[in-house]
Amino acid sequence: MTARFHPSNTLPRSVTIWLCIVMAMIVIMVMVGGVTRLTQSGLSMVDWRPIMGIIPPLTQLDWQDAFAAYKQFPEYKTLNYGMTLSEFKGIFLMEYSHRVWGRLIGLVFMVPLMWFFIRGTVCGPLAWKLLGLLLLGAAQGAMGWIMVKSGLSD
């Protein structure tokens, strides 16, 4: 009988654990993304600030400013006209969690990947595959940004 291939037989344990954590985070992201889509929350954050965007509105004035900005876009005018600030907070926080989780996945993937490259833990074909996954993750983020931008203009 031949032995079945199992990734943990060939990868260092640290790499296997890291990839399993990233995989679990992606599964959670799919669920959060689905809820974001079903609640039509994706366009509630009308600006994209990759660095400073991690900080949500903190004061009542911040929330009012974010809501006023949202009211300027077609989604509010056609779908959510009459929405209250409290309702807006709900959809905003859904999209906020979606974006923050995406950034966190990027960090959890990229930082250990750099560490594994520096230490020589991953090299050869595996290194290229992991770099490809990093590029696919970046492309997914870019597609999300394009989807939001196009939704804000139509």
Task: Show which residues each predicted segment covers.
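Individual transmembrane alpha-helix segments
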Residues: 69-109
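Short, Lys/Arg-rich, polar N-terminal cytosolic tail immediately upstream
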Residues: 1-11
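Interfacial helix-loop-helix junctions of multi-pass membrane proteins
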Residues: 36-47, 141-154
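N-terminal signal-anchor transmembrane alpha helix
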Residues: 15-54
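Membrane-interfacial alpha-helical segments at the cytosolic side of multi-pass membrane proteins
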Residues: 103-120, 133
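Membrane-interfacial loop-to-transmembrane alpha-helix junctions, especially the N-terminal start
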Residues: 124-134
